[in-house]
Amino acid sequence: MGQKINPFGYRLGITENHRSKWFSDSNKAGERYRDFVLEDDQIRKEMSKDLERAGVSRIVIERTRDRVRVDIHTARPGIVIGRRGAEAERVRAKLEKLTGKQVQLNIFEVKNAALDAQLVAQGIAEQLTNRVTFRRAMRKAQQDAMRAGAKGIRIKLSGRLGGAEMSRSEFYREGRVPLQTLRALIDYGFFEAKTTYGRIGVKVWIYKGDMTESEFEEQQAQQNNRPGRRGGDRRPRRGNRSAAPQAAEAPKAEAPAEAAPAAETKE
């Protein structure tokens, strides 16, 4: 009991969108679905390692036939871009070597870092690495998030807190954090702090309010209108059983209409 599902995966397709936008049904080596999944994971790991101090919130990957588009959302775009774009060019060259395709690198700035759960988790982890008391780091993150307009925040730390011999978990919550409400806009972030006592896991949930009725219906309409999705322009499958009865019933409905004029001519 008490196990928490990832809020991002739980609301995927409802209030959250995919962060890898592509599809592959090829059997060719290097272009298979599993190859792209592994490549996406490698891209995210390399970016997180190289841009650890840049405050990367999320990375969105979109693929076409001959190009890979990588969108980096960061709180410190100056570190990612570098002097005269040198750092961005280095990152792009590294991604092109990894993927073997042309890479389009886009850098977006996160306007309010206090409301981004991933950035809040990274901030707490940095303070723990710098030997700041964990309760003080949690309290400061809560206050900053609530001042920025959050409806609620929940922070959980797990590990050897304060250098204790036995590991434990502590969490603080302020406001409302409805994890079971699908329309709730909840941002989730996780980061590990590397301290002298070991690693401390930091989890952050931030509640930003509920999605309105009009926004919810609009997003559902966009999901249903996608080609190849249910409710959209979907082609019938081969051997579809539902189409067979309709084809069999069609001639039966036309037969009485043809017999009616023949009965009138006899009279």
Curated annotation (Swiss-Prot):
Pfam families: KH_2, Ribosomal_S3_C. CDD domains: KH-II_30S_S3 (cd02412). Gene3D superfamilies: 3.30.300.20, Ribosomal protein S3, C-terminal domain (3.30.1140.32). Keywords: Ribonucleoprotein, Ribosomal protein, RNA-binding, rRNA-binding. One of its GO terms (cellular component) is cytosolic small ribosomal subunit. Residues 241-267 have a biased composition (Low complexity). GO terms for molecular function: mRNA binding; rRNA binding; structural constituent of ribosome. PROSITE patterns: KH_TYPE_2, RIBOSOMAL_S3. One of its GO terms (biological process) is translation. InterPro entries: KH_dom, KH_dom-like_a/b, KH_dom_type_2, KH_sf_prok-type, Ribosomal_S3_C_sf, Ribosomal_uS3_bac-typ, Ribosomal_uS3_C, Ribosomal_uS3_CS. The keyword Metal-binding does not apply. Residues 43-111 form the KH type-2 domain. Residues 216-267 are annotated as: Disordered. Part of the 30S ribosomal subunit. Forms a tight complex with proteins S10 and S14. Binds the lower part of the 30S subunit head. Binds mRNA in the 70S ribosome, positioning it for translation. HAMAP family: Ribosomal_uS3_B (MF_01309_B). Belongs to the universal ribosomal protein uS3 family. This is Small ribosomal subunit protein uS3. It comes from Bifidobacterium longum (strain NCC 2705).
